[in-house]
Amino acid sequence: LKNFISNSDKLGFVGIFYMLFVYIMFFKDYDYIVNKIHQTTRREIYKSFFIYTIFFIVFPAIFIVLNLLLSFYDSNLFKKILLFLFTWLIFFALFKVSVNKIISTKAAFISSFLTLTTLSITKNLFIYYVVYNKTYTTIYGSLSTLLFSILWIYISWIIYLYGIKICHKLNMKYLNQVV
């Protein structure tokens, strides 16, 4: 992290412009995919930019405060539970706010919990596989780290998008019960 921060001043105008471009394009695509899953229209680009910029600023700030508060506690179990709850809050907020229509709180609550639980279990299984399977490290060397990182990003996004799909199905179910 120190190296990243110390190198950030070397980006220059073009680098900062490129990072901003990638940020906007990522959230534009994310907004398109999430709204397509929920079968609704997309937001205007400036509204999406505003919403995701708030996420990008507020949640890391809350995470820093949470880590500072957790540094005063010795209990690992308490820390793990609190971090799980905080991550659940992030998923809940993303599931609730990302879509350009009203999402049932119950649907977002259940689907975000299922998604986070699946992601946590898969993460532990993936770590176990990477640590104990030495074949890839032997064949590919340090390049295997890059391969596993890309594979993990792919798997985690599949899980996240299926969580969004579960949220859509539950939302349709709960909204039909209200009507």
Predicted regions mapped to residue ranges:
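Membrane-embedded alpha-helices and immediately adjacent juxtamembrane helical segments
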Residues: 1-179
